[in-house]
From Swiss-Prot:
Keywords: ATP-binding, Cytoplasm, Decarboxylase, Gluconeogenesis, Lyase, Manganese, Metal-binding, Nucleotide-binding. The lineage of its organism: Bacteria, Pseudomonadati, Pseudomonadota, Alphaproteobacteria, Hyphomicrobiales. GO terms for cellular component: cytosol. Involved in the gluconeogenesis. Catalyzes the conversion of oxaloacetate (OAA) to phosphoenolpyruvate (PEP) through direct phosphoryl transfer between the nucleoside triphosphate and OAA. ATP binds at residues 201, 220, 236-244, 285, 322, 447. It comes from Agrobacterium fabrum (strain C58 / ATCC 33970). The keyword Metal-binding applies. It is an enzyme of class 4 (lyase). Pathway: Carbohydrate biosynthesis; gluconeogenesis. This is Phosphoenolpyruvate carboxykinase (ATP).
C-alpha cells in the first residue's frame, strides 16, 4: 500500500482494516483534490472555478436506508420509534465486506473536527473513494491546524464507498444503499449512494447522540451574533427562511445549519455551508452566490450549459441542487464559530394555512412544546388548482438526525432557556390574509422589522394580546409594521373561515403531540394550543 500526505504514521488506514487499498492520499488540499477528481472523471470545472459533480440515482438523503447498531449501550438510549436497528452481527458482516471491497482501490482521507468548542469537539476521520467527497467534507467540517495532523487521533470514522452495494439478505438492510452507524464504537459505513450530504449528516447524528449525555444541547439551527455579543439561534425546517433571516449584515454569522449549546455558550459543529442552489441569484442572495461561483466550492447536481456556466434555475437533475463551501467564503462569518449564551431563540415556521401571526412570544414551556412539534406547512402544489396546504411536523426541527428521544432534547432546551433567561419567539414567514392560494406571503420587510425588534429587545416593551387559539402573546403594534398583519383574523375577508381554519390547525397540533404527552410534565402539556395564558 502506497500512503501519501501528512498524517499520523501510527494511525494509518491499516488500523481500520483498509491495508489492502492500493493508494491512500491523506489530507490533500483543494488544488490536489481538484486534480484527482477531474483526472478520475468524477467531476468537472465550472467557468468560475467551482468543482461540479453529479450523484446519479441518489440526489438526496436516503433516510429509509439509515440504521443504528442496537447493542447493550444503545438499547435504552436510542429512540427506536424513529431509528432503524441493525444487529452487531450484521454490522460486522457489512464492515468486513466493505473493507474487502476497498482492496486495490485508491482512497482519500481527511482528518477533521466536528464542533468548534474544544471541550466538545469530535475528531473525525473521513475515508472516501471519491476525491470530490473528500473536498466536500473538507469544506464542511472544521480543519485542524496542519501541524497537528501528525498526531491526529479520531473518535469517529466514516468510510464511504459509493461503489459498494449492500446485500439486504446478508447484511440485514433494506436495499443496496446503506448508512449504518455504530455509535458505541464510533464508526459509520456508507455505501451505494454518492449523495455527499450523507457524510455531513452522519457527523451531526453522532454529535446529537453524544452531546446530551454531557449536558450539551445539539441543535438543527442557524445562528448569528450582534455587535454587543448578543447571540441568537434560528430553528426552522426547510423553506422557512432559516438561512435567509440569519444572514443579517448587522450581525456576524456563526453558522447556517448545526450548532451546540453548552456550558460556555453556542458553537458551530461545522466549518462550512451546504446551501441550496436552486434558483440561486446574485440579486436575492449575493453572498451565497459569490461563495458558490469560485474556486474551492463543490457544486452538487447543478446543471452546466455548454460553456460550463451553472444554470441555477435548471432542476432537471433534482430540485435539491447544492453548493458546499467553507464558511470563510462568506464575508460576515465568524472566525471562531463560537459565541456566548443566546439572548434570543427564534422558531421559524411557514404557515401556509394563514392562521399564525407573524410573531409571537413564547414561555419556556410553550417553546418546548413548539420545539417538540417542529411545525411548518408545505404547499401541496399549484397544478389543477390544488391549493390545500400540507402540515409537516418534524420534532426538534430535525427528526431524521435525532437518535435520542425528542423529550431529552426538549427538556435540555427548556432547562437552558430557563437558566440563561432566553427570550423565545415564534416567527411565521408563511401566509397572511388567507391560506395559500387566497392570501399572500408574509412581507419579508415586516418579518425583518419584527425580527430586528425581537433581537434588540425592543419588542419586549410592546403591548401584547393573548392569542385565542394558541395562547401565546402577540404584539399589538410595532412602528413601521402594518398593525393589521399582527392580527391574522383581521386580514381574512371571512372571519368565520379563519376561525374554522384555526380550529383545524389547532387540532393538528394536538393530534401530533399525543405521542409526546407521556414524556413531558403537566406545564408543557398545558402549553398546547388554546390552553395556556400568554407569556408575561
Amino acid at each position: 500500500m502506497n500512503e501519501l500526505g501528512v498524517h499520523n504514521p501510527a494511525n494509518g488506514v491499516a488500523e481500520l482494516g483498509l491495508g489492502e487499498a492500493s493508494r491512500v492520499f491523506y489530507n490533500l488540499n483543494e488544488s490536489e483534490l481538484y486534480e484527482h477528481a477531474i483526472r478520475n472523471g468524477e467531476a468537472e470545472l465550472t467557468i468560475d472555478g467551482a468543482l461540479r459533480a453529479v450523484t446519479g440515482q441518489h440526489t438526496g438523503r436516503s433516510p429509509k436506508d439509515k440504521f443504528v447498531v442496537r447493542d447493550a449501550s444503545t438499547e435504552n438510549t436510542i429512540w427506536w420509534d424513529n431509528n432503524k436497528p441493525l444487529s452487531p452481527e450484521n454490522f460486522e458482516l457489512l464492515r468486513q465486506d466493505m473493507l474487502a471491497h476497498a482492496a486495490g482501490k485508491t482512497l482519500y482521507v481527511q482528518d477533521l473536527i466536528g464542533g468548534a468548542d474544544e471541550e466538545n469537539a469530535l475528531p473525525t476521520r473521513v475515508v472516501t473513494e471519491l476525491a470530490w467527497h473528500s473536498l466536500f467534507i473538507r469544506n464542511l467540517l472544521i480543519r485542524p491546524k496542519r501541524e497537528t495532523l501528525s498526531g491526529f487521533s479520531q473518535k469517529l470514522t466514516i468510510i464511504n464507498l459509493p461503489s459498494f452495494k449492500a446485500d439486504p439478505a446478508r447484511h440485514g438492510v433494506r436495499s443496496e444503499t446503506v448508512i449504518a452507524c455504530d455509535l458505541t464504537n464510533g464508526l459509520v459505513l456508507i455505501g451505494g449512494t454518492s449523495y455527499a450530504g450523507e457524510n455531513k449528516k452522519s457527523v451531526f447524528t453522532v454529535l446529537n447522540y453524544l452531546l446530551p449525555a454531557k449536558g450539551v444541547m445539539p441543535m438543527h439551527c442557524s445562528a448569528n451574533v450582534g455587535p454587543e455579543g448578543d447571540s441568537a439561534v434560528f430553528f426552522g425546517l426547510s423553506g422557512t427562511g432559516k438561512t435567509t433571516l440569519s444572514a443579517d449584515p448587522a450581525r456576524t454569522l456563526i453558522g447556517d445549519d448545526e450548532h451546540g449549546w453548552g456550558e460556555h455558550g453556542i458553537f458551530n459543529f461545522e466549518g462550512g455551508c451546504y446551501a441550496k442552489a436552486i434558483k440561486l441569484s446574485s440579486e436575492a442572495e449575493p453572498e451565497i452566490y459569490a461563495a458558490t461561483n469560485r474556486f474551492g466550492t463543490v457544486l452538487e447536481n447543478v446543471v452546466l450549459d455548454e460553456s460550463r456556466v451553472p444554470d441555477f434555475n435548471d432542476n432537471s437533475l433534482t430540485e435539491n441542487t447544492r453548493s458546499a463551501y467553507p464558511l470563510h467564503f462568506i464575508p460576515n462569518a465568524s472566525e471562531t464559530g463560537i459565541a456566548g449564551h443566546p439572548k434570543t431563540i427564534i422558531m421559524l415556521t411557514a404557515d401556509a394555512f394563514g392562521v399564525l401571526p407573524p410573531i409571537a412570544r413564547l414561555t419556556p414551556e410553550q417553546a418546548m412544546y413548539h420545539f417538540l412539534s417542529g411545525y411548518t406547512a408545505k404547499v401541496a402544489g399549484t397544478e389543477k388548482g390544488v391549493t390545500e396546504p400540507e402540515a409537516t411536523f418534524s420534532t426538534c426541527f430535525g427528526a431524521p438526525f435525532m437518535p435520542r428521544h425528542p423529550a431529552e432534547y426538549g427538556n435540555l432546551l427548556r432547562e437552558l432557556i430557563g437558566k440563561h433567561g432566553v427570550d423565545c419567539w415564534l416567527v411565521n414567514t408563511g401566509w397572511t390574509g388567507g391560506a395559500y392560494g387566497i392570501g399572500k406571503r408574509m412581507p419579508i420587510k415586516a418579518t425583518r422589522a419584527l425580527l430586528t425588534a425581537a433581537l434588540t429587545g425592543d419588542l419586549k416593551n410592546a403591548q401584547f394580546r393573548t392569542d385565542a387559539n394558541f395562547g401565546f402573546a402577540v404584539p399589538l403594534s410595532l412602528d413601521g409594521v402594518d398593525g393589521a398583519i399582527l392580527d391574522p383574523r383581521s386580514t381574512w375577508a371571512d372571519g368565520a373561515a379563519y376561525d374554522a381554519q384555526a380550529k383545524k390547525l389547532v387540532s393538528m397540533f394536538v393530534s401530533n403531540f399525543t405521542k409526546f404527552e407521556d414524556h413531558v410534565d403537566s406545564k408543557v402539556r398545558d402549553a398546547a394550543p388554546g390552553l395556556l395564558l400568554a407569556a408575561e
